[in-house]
Amino acid sequence: MRPIGPIAFCALALCLAGCQTTSTHQFATPAPTWATKSGQLSYQGPKISLIGEVLVRYSKAGELELAFSKGPGVNLLLLRQDAQFASAEGPLAHGRWAGASASAPERLRGWFGLREQILAGRNSIQTNAGGERFNLRF
């Protein structure tokens, strides 16, 4: 009789590999032609409220990179997004997520919703999404 341990281990490894949250999508690298804005972001979520610094870079083609931090060296969230794909990492993302924007987890949808308003060139953004409030000023 064969031991079931190695077979169970292989089956588990294959299942977990299918749960991966990394993406093979390559986001554009920020270039000198990208617009850069810095300011403050007030975030109020269901369990936490934070005010921190935000750095946003975006291209005319719609690629976006947003970094939200609470002082030097305390990165809370790094977002990358284009028209179809998005990625988020950091404590506010509960780790790391990447994939199609349309399939983003509920906890990230409000963050990814900021893209359109930032690309519109607004210097002040106030929005509510899914129990979260964002107040962004450049």
Language model features by range: what are they?
Residues I4-I7, E106, T127-G130:
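Generic low-complexity segments that are intrinsically disordered, proline-rich and/or Lys/Arg-biased
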Residues E63-E116:
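An acidic-aromatic
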Residues L16-W34:
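Bacterial Sec signal peptide processing site at the extreme N-terminus
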